[in-house]
Curated annotation (Swiss-Prot):
It holds the Pfam family Methyltr_RsmB-F. Its EC number is 2.1.1.176. Specifically methylates the cytosine at position 967 (m5C967) of 16S rRNA. HAMAP family: 16SrRNA_methyltr_B (MF_01856). The active site is at 375 (nucleophile). Coiled coil: none annotated. InterPro entries: MeTrfase_RsmB-F_NOP2_cat (IPR049560), MeTrfase_RsmB-F_NOP2_dom (IPR001678), NusB-like_sf (IPR035926), NusB_RsmB_TIM44 (IPR006027), RCMT (IPR023267), rRNA_ssu_MeTfrase_B (IPR004573), rRNA_ssu_MeTfrase_B_ent (IPR023541), RsmB-like_ferredoxin (IPR054728). SUPFAM superfamilies: NusB-like, S-adenosyl-L-methionine-dependent methyltransferases. This is Ribosomal RNA small subunit methyltransferase B. Residues 397-419 are annotated as: Disordered. Residues 400-412 have a biased composition (Polar residues).
Amino acid sequence: MKKQNNLRSLAAQAVEQVVEQGQSLSNVLPPLQQKVADKDKALLQELCFGVLRTLSQLEWLINKLMSRPMTGKQRTVHYLIMVGFYQLLYTRVPPHAALAETVEGAVSIKRPQLKGLINGVLRQFQRQQETLLNEFATSDARFLHPGWLVKRLQNAYPTQWQHIIEANNQRPPMWLRVNRTHHTRDGWLGLLEDAGMKGYPHPDYPDAVRLETPAPVHALPGFAEGWVTVQDASAQGCAVFLAPQNGEHILDLCAAPGGKTTHILEVAPEADVLAVDIDEQRLSRVYDNLKRLGMKATVKQGDGRYPSQWCGEQQFDRILLDAPCSATGVIRRHPDIKWLRRDRDIAELAQLQAEILDAVWPRLKPGGTLVYATCSVLPEENRDQIKTFLQRTPDAALSETGTPDQPGQQNLPGGEEGDGFFYAKLIKK
């Protein structure tokens, strides 16, 4: 059966579910993708990601051009107008097509009586575009981030906060991890070149390759066979710092979707790995990743605060704790994070991280290594967290990463580099 859903109305519904209902775009988008033809999936994704990336600008424009907000059952139209603005500002969709398709979206969401309103607002924007954009360039909304997050970044990074915000507003590069059990990185780069694509090795992470141009995974040499995995360069730093060895008992805590679990097994194929995550639904992706790569690990559902429930009294040679966090280092990959997080979440997350650290530390053998990692750029979850942990944990010592005053290594997002990420390598005395 031919799929003929209006893309613009689907994008508006997706954004509404994220902003109004607090749902993650990664949960909202896949079922909507099933409603459109394959050739239209990329545009639907671009509209959803793009509107969420620039949401504060689009909201600002609506407030300038409409006397009162759309509410109640008409609220989806509010987001449909945003989709129209985004196309006119940021895509190569011809303006006449952007207008026509967006206006027609009102029919799909059963608001045909509002077609004239949508058309009028979008045409008014076209007429006033230059004036409006000049005014927007000096407004508080120009950073495309919620005010609370801008303030936190300014406080934490007085000289770098604008760089972080600019990086967050960019499209991310596509990083891959070459499976060293199949190929050397240089060998796989040769296969990539034979396939007509170009990639660049990361200077610090030995398995990481950045594609010159993002590509679908089925086009990558040996993806189905497990030769390569999509994983950001900074995320690959976790296994690099962990330095797993064959024969060791290793715990990967907060493991879903399994990218770090499989990286550990690529580095140390004969390690005994236990992968644990609290989210049973996301654990299915750990199984999928292990299956594609032909690897074996023990996978369990469990809460990191209560290790006795999922590992008894077992101790480990190495532990990777990729702690639950604000994800403020991966906003360019997941722009919905800006609108799903709240200022109050940060203290709650820091408390949860501390509880997991304290609970899992006794499960590390003396002389063992624990790598604490987050995809956050906020000090409360990173350096401050590790500083206070070291103060209250006499048998913990910092190794390789930072100093007691400035513990850990903080990667900031930017350009063609990896995402924002924090690592602290701790040794049990």
